Regions:
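Bacterial N-terminal signal peptides
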Residues: 4-16
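An active-site-proximal "capping" alpha-helix that borders the catalytic cofactor pocket
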Residues: 61, 102-117
Length: 230
């Protein structure tokens, strides 16, 4: 028995020694727990750290999409919405980022690499891809999950949250963007985003959020000599 145990130990050591070292790879979702939602949520919280389009933005998009759909009495597939909301901006982060392509298209193409093995129902992956691909306000969503994610994401560019997100991008060392360029981004959002909110409930949210952003820009210009001292 001792000899057999010794041989097993030696063989195990040799096998372990012969295994090649794992190559450096992009971070992947952890092994599947009982609840795949927790896996995806934890993955997003760990990997997506950014003041404008990080984990907290994904949380807001998910919650607001559900609110808007409920207000419109529309039933959503929560599996599709949850996965799309928490992973829609993954290609804005390294190592998934591709500066030559729209981050929406890149994320839609690779989102399965995160969801596989988590317990997510992969038969729904195409719906997740579609919602991610059209989440930006300048794209046209198809299907309820895509529509309400699109509108939630658009509304997050307006109001006080929209201001906070854009101003968080300002380089504290005077790089790009500076304060005036951030203001230009806010003005562009004010001009372009409202008309692209498409759902009835979403459109109902536009006016007060637009007014908040307009008020901020008006006050900022007044208090900075029309941005000259910003």
């Amino acid at each position: 028995m001792r000899v057999a145990a010794l041989l097993i130990g030696i063989i195990g050591g040799v096998i372990g020694w012969c295994e090649p070292a794992a190559a450096a790879e992009a971070p992947t979702a952890p092994a599947a727990p009982t609840d795949w939602h927790a896996t995806v949520r934890d993955f997003a919280a760990k990997q997506f750290k950014h003041p404008a389009w990080g984990y907290s933005h994904s949380m807001r998009d998910y919650a607001l999409a559900r609110e808007l759909a409920a207000a419109d009495h529309v039933i959503l597939d929560d599996d599709v919405l949850f996965a799309a909301a928490y992973l829609h901006d993954m290609a804005a982060f390294k190592p998934w980022e591709n500066e030559k392509l729209d981050h929406s298209d890149v994320a839609a193409g690779i989102v399965d690499t995160v969801l596989k093995g988590t317990g997510f129902p992969m038969a729904k992956i195409d719906a997740v891809r579609g919602a991610i691909r059209t989440h930006m306000y300048y794209r046209d969503p198809v299907g309820p999950e895509a529509l309400y994610l699109h509108d939630a994401d658009a509304l997050d560019w307006l109001g006080a949250i929209g201001v906070a997100r854009v101003m968080a991008l300002v380089d504290p060392n005077g790089g790009d963007p500076d304060g005036p360029k951030a203001v230009k981004m806010l003005e562009d959002n004010l001009k372009d985003v409202p008309a692209r909110v498409l759902s009835p409930a979403g459109r109902g949210r536009v006016a007060p959020l637009k007014a908040e952003l307009e008020g901020f820009l008006r006050d900022l210009r007044r208090e900075s000599e029309n941005l000259r001292t910003l």
